[in-house]
Amino acid sequence: MNEEVSRPTRVALEIRKTLMEILHRDTKDPRLEKVNITECKISKDLSIATVYFTIIGVNEKDQPAQDAIKALEKAKGFFRSEIGKRMNLRITPEVRFFYDTVAENASHIEELIFKALHQKK
């Protein structure tokens, strides 16, 4: 099977990889130490990169997550600049950060299913 990955998908994967390198090697902000980039999606015209992140053991509403959001927003220009330097793109995409709630939602759904299955009839 010869499935070719689309250019936006390849660029999104490379941006995710690049951001992880930047976070782990080049940032000194302690609020970003435990941040993990879970996914990156990019618009078809490659102008906007939507980046999802999480911190293990932390919910979106917890203070460490809120601090990380503030730090990422403050440093988004730095991240964009570094992406531009490290990747050979005609246009460096705008970077938008969002806390990834998939794990939280999955945990909540599992809990609801467990309760429903073990409810006394």
From Swiss-Prot:
Location in the cell: Cytoplasm
Keyword Cytoplasm: yes
Keyword flag Cytoplasm: yes
Superkingdom of the source species: Bacteria
Gene3D superfamilies according to UniProt: 3.30.300.20
Gene Ontology biological-process annotations: maturation of SSU-rRNA
Location, primary (coarse class): cytoplasm
Matching PROSITE patterns: RBFA
Pfam families: RBFA
Reported function: One of several proteins that assist in the late maturation steps of the functional core of the 30S ribosomal subunit. Associates with free 30S ribosomal subunits (but not with 30S subunits that are part of 70S ribosomes or polysomes). Required for efficient processing of 16S rRNA. May interact with the 5'-terminal helix region of 16S rRNA.
Subunit structure: Monomer. Binds 30S ribosomal subunits, but not 50S ribosomal subunits or 70S ribosomes.
Protein family according to the UniProt entry: Belongs to the RbfA family.
Protein name: Ribosome-binding factor A
